[in-house]
Amino acid sequence: MATVIDRHSQPTWRDFLELTKPKVVVLMLITSLIGMLLATKAPLDGFVPWQVLIFGNLGIGLCAGAAAAVNHVVDRRIDSIMARTHKRPLAEGRVSPSMALGFALLLALAGMAVLLAFTNPLTAWLTLASLLGYAALYTGFLKRATPQNIVIGGLAGAAPPLLGWVAITGHLSAEPLLLVLIIFAWTPPHFWALCIHRKDEYAKADIPMLPVTHGERYTKLHILLYTLVLFAVSLMPFVIHMSGLVYLLCALALGARFLDWAWALYCDSRPHAAIRTFKYSIVYLFLLFMALLVDHYLPLKLLL
């Protein structure tokens, strides 16, 4: 016991950095930056104002880190069971729950202060809503309550491009909501493919993920159905004249490949299809948003 107390009293800076899930935060900030860039009127404005670029992403990143730290606290028992997470700071006892919560509160307050001071109130309150949606609604309740947890809770994870857009414009509009809808539709096939691959771990931790509660066949069908929805939603930026032909062609090609993987997973026609579908889903989302950016700034490139 003395050793545990000593370890709690001497966490390192790396432990606190790990609490923020830095890789996840970086991905969120990339989508936030994309939202900012898409909200900037190319080619007239060209780029994001430096104040919003730096402080907007700093505030969003701090709040995202706070939500991640709360997730570590709530999931510490689950993390200690699962192979992928059993070495996390709270699971191993390197940081105490009270210390992690205090750290999360500090990050959240700092993030909100930065957003209120350097962006606009709407960005700050939407960021707070996203933080609470992930930390309280998803992690604290939905994750253990329903196999549809990732569908409902996916809205919080889909928020960063909206936050980046609103940091520039100061108001809501159809375009950033469509970006949220794309990530919202992408989340179930992305995450359920991973859940199939790690089904036994989730069952051991008593988390009601869809493959655990309804079986792999049912989950694979829903991955296919959600991928069809995603394919349709991904074409909407072209339909509402948010993007042009370059994006449309990329969305069609990327979506067709995603459907190919979802079908292969459903039919069990390729080895390791679940984890390969999961990995492709990450590539898909990255390239889709890059296509939006290229299409957005293409007129600027043509004028140079």
UniProtKB/Swiss-Prot annotation:
GO terms for biological process: heme O biosynthetic process. GO terms for molecular function: protoheme IX farnesyltransferase activity. It is found in: Cell inner membrane. It catalyses: heme b + (2E,6E)-farnesyl diphosphate + H2O = Fe(II)-heme o + diphosphate. Keywords: Cell inner membrane, Cell membrane, Heme biosynthesis, Membrane, Transferase, Transmembrane, Transmembrane helix. Its main location: membrane. Converts heme B (protoheme IX) to heme O by substitution of the vinyl group on carbon 2 of heme B porphyrin ring with a hydroxyethyl farnesyl side group. Belongs to the UbiA prenyltransferase family. Protoheme IX farnesyltransferase subfamily. This is Protoheme IX farnesyltransferase 1. The lineage of its organism: Bacteria, Pseudomonadati, Pseudomonadota, Gammaproteobacteria, Pseudomonadales.
